Every structure is written in C-alpha cells, then in structure tokens.
Design a protein with these regions (language model features):
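Charge-dense, helix-prone N-terminal extensions
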Residues: 1-156
Length: 156
C-alpha cells in the first residue's frame, strides 16, 4: 500500500483459495455425513469455542476456523496471507484438525493426543473417541496463542 503498510487480507485473497466466508457454520456442521462425523463435528465446535472463546468462521467450503494470523511461507516468502489459528473439518473419511502442530510446543505434545495420522498441515483423526480430549484442548490453546509470522519485507 502507498503508506508502507501491507493489506495482508487482500494479498491472501489473490493467493489463497481458503478464505473466510459468510456461510453458516452451524448449518455446515449439521449437514456433515455420516452421522458420526456430524456428532464429532458438533462436539469439536463446542471444544474449540470453549478453549478459544471465539466464534467459528467457515473458511472456504469446509474448514471451521477460529481466529486468524498472517502467515508467510518459509519456502516462498512471497506466499502470504491470512489463515485460521486453529480449526477443523469434519470430512467424510476423517476429522482434519488444523494448527495443532504449527508451533514447537504443539508438535512436542502431539504424540500424547492418541490415535492420529499427520498430513502436511493438519492432523487426521478417525473419531473423537480415539484421542485424549484434554490433550486436544491443550493443543488448541497452544495454537490459539500463535501470533503473526514476521514480515520479511523491509518496512517503508
């Protein structure tokens, strides 16, 4: 921007496909299938809200996000934008949990979570009964405390 500040959200709109929407999160969660995924999604919404105190926002078509931070990709500093601090998606095959391993403290605690697999940017869980909800709450709190990534560009 002309004043030397950066409009991160505008930059993310141009580069990221997963952006906040005005879609109704409750409607989205109640439409999840199968029924087990719907129940787990509703329970996750309760847990995430309880820990963060934030209202959920649907990011893209399927990610329930809480809060946001400004990210800068470590692989390509030109890739930047806004992203939820933490969140989840009740996908048909499994639950996707976001932000839980982004910070060193969370990554160190992750093995205590229970039965899960890892993706590049998320943790996959088959069902909530497979994990320790107290550990999940701690992981959410760690993710929630995250700040913005530093902007590597010199300020004007």
């Amino acid at each position: 921007m002309a004043d030397g500040t950066h409009d991160w959200h505008t930059e993310s709109m141009a580069e990221a496909k997963t952006v906040p929407t005005d879609a109704d999160v409750d409607e989205f969660l109640h439409a999840a299938t199968p029924a087990r995924r719907q129940a787990d999604g509703l329970k996750l919404a309760e847990i995430f809200h309880d820990v963060t105190g934030a209202d959920p926002v649907l990011w893209g078509p399927s990610m329930v996000g809480y809060g946001s931070y400004r990210f800068v990709s470590p692989n390509n500093p030109r890739t930047r934008g806004d992203w939820p601090k933490t969140g989840f998606s009740p996908r048909k095959a499994q639950l996707s949990l976001y932000g839980l391993k982004d910070r060193a403290e969370g990554a160190a605690l992750l093995p205590s979570l229970g039965t899960y697999t890892e993706g590049a940017g998320c943790v996959y869980v088959k069902k909530l009964d497979d994990i320790d909800v107290a550990v999940l709450r701690r992981l959410i709190a760690i993710a929630w405390a995250r700040g913005d990534d530093p902007d590597p560009r010199p300020s004007a």
